[in-house]
């Protein structure tokens, strides 16, 4: 929506062959196929979900491509690459992370193209999977869904207050806003 059906995009992935990057690629390829003006310059690029590697990969892309309109990434390394290069931060799609939200809060005013939408990092899915697994092993019915559609967690372009960007400087950078854990527990876990 933010790109208006046209623009140059770079997509980062995680580890080579991981199912999350593969399933996301199915989705974005389907969407981008409907918008011939969107060009994927690179991706999914394996970054091992490592912010330093993602920054390095993005720095190389910045040197190679004069115009990058969007990034899909799960780390904040690409933001640091744009800041270091003195280039405007482009539109961003990824997973919710406190550090990402705080970087948006700190830099969006000076970077009007830095619009951000995140989906839940879905750390809470382990809890759901464990309950379903235990129910299956013990012959107990579990009606929780097996397929989950991840809605937006944050959308800087939305007027919906529930989707506002959720920077909390009292929490560690690695805190995940959608984790369904109290702030106190998150501080303890991420010490």
Regions found by a protein language model. Give the residues of each.
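Hinge/cleft segment of the Venus flytrap/periplasmic-binding protein
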Residues: 12, 16, 121, 130-191
């Amino acid at each position: 929506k933010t790109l208006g059906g046209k623009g140059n995009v770079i997509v980062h992935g995680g580890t080579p062959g991981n199912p999350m990057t593969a399933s996301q690629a199915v989705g974005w390829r389907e969407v981008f196929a409907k918008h011939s003006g969107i060009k994927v310059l690179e991706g999914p690029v394996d970054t091992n979900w490592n912010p330093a590697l993602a920054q390095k990969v993005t720095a190389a892309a910045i040197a190679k491509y004069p115009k990058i309109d969007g990034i899909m990434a799960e780390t904040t390394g690409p933001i640091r690459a744009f800041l270091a290069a003195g280039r405007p931060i482009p539109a961003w799609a990824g997973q919710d992370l406190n550090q990402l939200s705080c970087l948006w809060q700190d830099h969006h005013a000076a970077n009007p193209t830095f619009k951000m939408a995140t989906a839940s990092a879905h750390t809470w899915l382990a809890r759901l999977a464990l309950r379903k697994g235990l129910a299956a092993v013990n012959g107990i019915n579990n009606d929780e869904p097996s397929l989950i559609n991840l809605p937006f967690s944050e959308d800087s372009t939305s007027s919906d207050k529930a989707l506002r960007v959720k920077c909390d400087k009292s929490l560690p950078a690695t805190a995940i806003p959608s984790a369904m854990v109290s702030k106190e527990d998150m501080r303890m876990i991420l010490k």
